[in-house]
């Protein structure tokens, strides 16, 4: 009589499921929208005008030199005296400040041309430009106001403290100073427009 095999057959091996594939990487964020073409063109035009006005203002102030023969108390003869911008610290500050504004306008004009050729200008870059424009506006406005105050005293005098007006003697010098201050005021207005333009562009991007 044969023996019965009581051993149970081994169960078939369990099929292991393959691990699921890793999820696909998220798509890259879309590039920032380029500034409108009108913005870039207007920005370049304003910065070129700013450069021209800053340079013109400095040149007119530096060339404001006039020599006159004036009467000095206690001296029997007329004395030659030269009026120039170096005689006033306010005018020296004016020339230095507008020179900085002119140098800044050169740099930012070149940057604006680059933004036109590569319109993917980031919002951070426009924000930095707006901040620097505000700083240059403060510099130009303070220099214009300081020089304007001194020029007004030279034109009208101040009877309360005994300051005599000098523009009746140094007429050419005063015309140069007045023209330079007027051009600097125009440069300040251009900087205001540049700040508004940058802020409007930032607002348009944030709204989107």
Curated annotation (Swiss-Prot):
GO cellular component assignments: plasma membrane
Subcellular location: Cell membrane
Keywords assigned by UniProt, alphabetized: Cell membrane, Membrane, Transmembrane, Transmembrane helix
Disulfide bridges in this chain: none
Start-end of Pro residues biased regions: 9-36
Residue spans, topological domain Extracellular: 63-89, 155-180
Residue numbers on the Cytoplasmic membrane side: 1-41, 111-133, 202-208
Similarity field: Belongs to the Casparian strip membrane proteins (CASP) family.
Name of the protein: CASP-like protein 1D1
Protein's organism: Vitis vinifera
